[in-house]
Amino acid sequence: MNIMSEAAVEKALDQKMNTVPYKMIGNDVSVYYGEKRALFDVNLNIRENTVTALIGPSGCGKSTFLRTLNRMNDTIENCRVTGKITLDEDDIYDPSIDVVELRARVGMVFQKPNPFPKSIYDNVSYGPRIHGLARTKAELDEVVETSLQKAGLWNEVKDRLQEPGTGLSGGQQQRLCIARAVAVSPEVILMDEPCSALDPIATAKVEELIHELRANFTIVIVTHSMQQAARVSQRTAMFHLGNLVEENDTDKMFTNPDDQRTQDYIMGRFG
């Protein structure tokens, strides 16, 4: 029996990860809030069907970069983005890009659960309705059920779909928001600290869900939890003072990072 050494297994996994195509490519991305520069020439590529974690101390630019990926920064007055970001081969900052369509392709789950003040059913069906993804009530019903199943919530709410989404627990509300995001069949899902307001049990459910969603979606997650980044991601990018310090396979980042700043942050020497 040919038993591969641990080093050989690690090398094989690295080679396999390196063959995964890029879904989004960021070239020399800088962000300005008025005269203040928040990101400095970031070059970061996001691999398809992979969970990429963005880590770093508060104010380092990780959430700012995340918001550039679906142009959420457009909603901030005096915010300016330079450089280039492509989704497949589409330049998402090209003037011809429909931003509403872009945000259907690149969905977002925020730090605090933010269900609409509508029923559970309407929370999930809203996106497919406005984007014309369901032509009949039967098709809409199917999208709602499938999305809630993907979010691991269907069995908990299937008998109360007309109750308000705001009546769910915090963890359930966050999974409802994930169901709402996947209902429009995005290609990428962005998550900005999706578990920071949740208890450990709800966090575990969301993390399990992230593992399952990776089969069908590309996921980028901002997290302050090193343990969470290590558990859920395959790639990790470290930000500091608006700069991308390094990006690599998660296992390598947490065991043998290339930059001392990454080592210091992971070890809790600053944060």
Swiss-Prot record:
Name of this chain's protein: Phosphate import ATP-binding protein PstB
Q: Tell me which species this is from.
A: Rhizobium meliloti (strain 1021)
Lineage per the UniProt record: Bacteria, Pseudomonadati, Pseudomonadota, Alphaproteobacteria, Hyphomicrobiales
**Residues that bind ATP:** G56, P57, S58, G59, C60, G61, K62, S63
Q: What is its EC number?
A: 7.3.2.1
Q: Which UniProt keywords apply?
A: ATP-binding, Cell inner membrane, Cell membrane, Membrane, Nucleotide-binding, Phosphate transport, Translocase, Transport
Kindly give the InterPro entries that the UniProt entry links to this protein.
AAA+_ATPase, ABC_transporter-like_ATP-bd, ABC_transporter-like_CS, P-loop_NTPase, PstB-like
| Domain called ABC transporter: residue spans | 24-266
Give a yes or no for keyword Repressor in this entry.
no
Its job: Part of the ABC transporter complex PstSACB involved in phosphate import. Responsible for energy coupling to the transport system.
Q: List the disulfide bonds.
A: none
Subcellular compartments:
Cell inner membrane
Query: What binding partners and quaternary form does the record give?
Result: The complex is composed of two ATP-binding proteins (PstB), two transmembrane proteins (PstC and PstA) and a solute-binding protein (PstS).
Q: Which Gene3D superfamilies match?
A: P-loop containing nucleotide triphosphate hydrolases (3.40.50.300)
